[in-house]
């Protein structure tokens, strides 16, 4: 029976890893559909190459930073327990690689290709796993300190703060340091509209992310005996709550409608194993509303050129999710309990601070040394031609 359990657990978390791997296709198509046509190829290449760099760096360094586990041992040892430790790495890698995928959407259309790969390596190798180890592996006694002060540890079941807020708040200084796209904001206060190049591809990306998210959340149990249907239904309710709120506040704009469910899913990650489904519905709806309001403010009033709105979507909604777990996870509101508002607030603030610090340092150093932004001419030509020497839809085919 023990051998059967080991095999089942390995299969369970492997399937979770595959589902979250598929989410990276969602990131790619969401960005492809949002950027202008001259940057579509770049969106696709960035996500795949960022994932590849993340895999190598997380395997060699990042996973060890977070969990103290090294893979510099024989294959016989790695294959023990049906290779469970390896597929657990695969599953958690897909989370780590989401950080540069999130950032990619914010800095789209004008960021240099190679400096961003360096940023990916540093963030996935050190910045992200440092905080991951604090929350999910009890590093440095931070969780014990939060528990001593508040009575409960900081709870983040599937990464509202550890993954999403981390990605969104690292992206904010990256976007600010990079600066806006040329001619995006005019001296007279006018804003040049850059509508999505393909609503169908944007919607496809959203749907791929939505489906994969059930692996992201449910499989965060990491073993089959800990699986919970509550996580699945709470994810569902938060998703539809975010959709409906974005529909109403976004006045039926298809971009908002297809980002609303993602906002809800970002927010529910932390407390999806604790909340009542009605609580998850409210959390998702608040997140959908937050995204619409904050995206509009950042783009139009604050002149922050965050192309996909990754700071509102992942940063703000992720932070809301971390705090919301301490509200709607409470037994007084139908949740399972074992959490409190103060602990959640402390953990969330710590995550936001670390992400901002990491983002400022990584992108600040890169801006000073290598530069972050394409030239005006390169940006005008588009990243597809500038970086990859081909467009998504060439005007003519080569005659063979």
Where in the sequence are the language-model features?
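Hydrophobic alpha-helical transmembrane bundles of multi-pass membrane proteins
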Residues: 1-400
